[in-house]
Amino acid sequence: MQPFIDLKNNLSFEDFKTEVLNDYKIAVMSRECSLIGRREVLTGKAKFGIFGDGKELPQLAMAKAFLKGDWRSGYYRDQTFMMAIGELTAQQFFADLYANTDLELEPMSAGRQMGGHFTTHSLDDNGNWKDLTKQYNSSADISPTAAQMPRLLGLAQASKIFRNVEDINTNNFSVGGNEVAWGTIGNASTSEGLFFETINAAGVLQVPMVISVWDDEYGISVHAKDHTTKENISEILKGFQRDNENKGFEILRVKGWDYPNLIETYQEAGAIAREEHVPVLIHVLELTQPQGHSTSGSHERYKSAERLAWEAKNDCNLKIREWIIESGISTNEALTEIERTIKRDIRDAKKNAWTAFLKPIQKEQQELLSLLKQVASSSVNGVFISKIKESLAKIDEPTRKDILSHARKCLRYTRGETSSEKKQLANWIDSIFENSQSKFSSHLYSETNQSNILIKEVKPTYNEDASQVDGRIILRDNFEALFSTYPEVLVFGEDTGNIGDVNQGLEGLQETFGELRVADTGIREATIIGQGIGMALRGLRPIAEIQYLDYILYALQIISDDLATTHYRTRGKQKAPLIIRTRGHRLEGIWHSGSQMGGILNLIRGVHVLVPRNMTKAAGFYNTLLQGDNPALVVECLNGYRLKEKMPTN
C-alpha cells in the first residue's frame, strides 16, 4: 500500500487525516454492526442475517466518488456505502434486521425485506417526486443475485436521455445528464446471464455506469474455479475493453485492501462515466468474508486453514489500520480508543433499536392482558382464559404472533357467549388486523390520487363519416400524439425503431422523434425491461416493447421480482410506472393453452395486466397509463393490426 496519496487539491495533511480517520470510524462501525448482527440472528432476535463485512474499504472509496443525483443499484453487502453517504445509521441497521414496520425507524423497507436491502426515498408522503438531484439515490434492492443489473442499465441510460433529448423536463431529475449509476455485485453472481446481458447492452448503449465486482473468490461455498473461466471476471471481459477504434468498457482492477489506490480508482471511474458517458467495470480483488456468507452456516466448513489464515491477515479493516499507523496519521492507542467508543455506541444502537421494536408490541400485550382479565371474569370458561392470560404475561419479548394467537384462543373459549367483554375483545382483534393491513400489505399499487384506476374514462368520439382504417393506424397516430405531448415518453424494443415495430404500430415515429426516443434494441428481453425500470425510477415514462408475449418468459423474473414489487417493498417511497407493450395471446403455439397468461396473472401482482379487445381500446389504455403512476403490461391482440376500425376524432 502506498504511504500517502493526496487526491484533492488544496487538501492539507490535517484535513486528509480527519477524512481518513472518519473513514476508519465508518469501517469500524460497519464491521461491528456485522459482528453484533450475526449474534442477534443466532440468538433468535432476527430470522436471517447477511452482512457487508470484508467489503468496507472499497465501499468507502465508492462513496467518495458518488455525488448527489447519482444512483446506486446494488445488493445486500453494501451497508458500509450506505453509512458513508449518510443514508444508514447503526440504529436503522438493527431496525432493518429486526424488521421494524415503522417507516420512520426503518426507512429501507418498513420491515418488508430482509436485512441488507437498501433504498432511499424518491417520493414524498403524497407520492410526489422529491428533487432527486439534491439527494443521494439508491434504487431498492432485491434478493435474487444479479437481478440488480438490468435496472442499473436503465438508471444509467436515463442520464443519456436527459443529456441528449431536447425539450425534456429535467427539473428534479437531472443536471445535464451528469448523473452516474453505480452498480455492485459479488464475483460469483457474475456467472448469471443477467450480468452478461447487462454488460453487453451497456457497451452498446454507452451509458454512464460504474459496476463494482466485490471479489472474495467464493460464492457461498463454491470457489471461483467453479464459477468463472480463468477464475477472473475482468480477464474474460477483456474483449469489452474500449480502444482507439471501438467503443466499449473501461475496465479497472484494484485490490480491496489498498485504501489510497481504491480512492484513486473510483475517482477515475466516476470521472470517465460522468464526463464521457462510458461504462466502467471495477474488479475489486483480494477481498475477504470474515463471517462467511451469512448466518446460515460457517465458512470453516469449506475454506482451508491456509485460506482462513490469509483472510485474517488481509482483512481490509486490518490493512487500513496498519497503514494509518505506518503513515503517521494516528497511533495504535488512539485507534484503540476509537474502536472502544464505537463498539459501545453500536451496542447502544442495537439496544435502542430492539427497545423501539418491542415497545408497540408490548403495548398491545398489555392491552390484551387487560381484555383477557375482563373476558375471564364474565365467561363460563374463565379458568381456562385466565391460564391464557398467565401464559401471555410470562412472555418478556412477545411477537405479534404470540399476541394474536393468545387472543384468538380466548375467542374459541367464548363460542356461543354474547358478553360485551367478548365483543370488545373481538373488536380489538379486528383493529389489530386492520392496522396490520397498512403495516404488511399496503402499497402494492399506487394509493395516491395519481392511481390509474381513479382516472376518469374518456370514450372515443367519431364523425358520422368516420373512415375505416387498419387498427395499427389508430395505434400509430395515438402514439404520435403522445410523443408530441410528453417529451419524457420513449419506446424501445426489438424492431421498434427503424421499421416501427413488426406490425407497424410505430411506423415513421423514429424519423419524427429521433433514435433516442424510438429505439431499436438487441434480442435481450430481461434488460429491455431493466432499461424501463431504471428510467421510470428516474422520472421518465418508458414503454418497453417485448416483441411477442411468448418472449416475456425471458423477462418474467425481472418483472415479478423487481418491477411488480418496487412500490410495495419501498412502502410507497419509490415508483416505476413502466409500460410494457407486447402482443400475442392467440391461443396458438407449443403451450398447451397457447398462452402464458395464467402464470403472468399470478406472478406479477403489482403490475396491471391489460388485454385490449381492439386497437382503439389499446390506445385508450396507453393514454390512461401515461396519466397514472402504476406499471402495466399491455397485451395487444395479434390479429387486430389489419382489422378495420373507425378512426376516432379524439
Q: What are these regions, as identified by a protein language model?
A:
Residues 99-108, 204-212, 517-520, 563-583, ...:
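A glycine-rich helix N-cap at a beta->alpha junction
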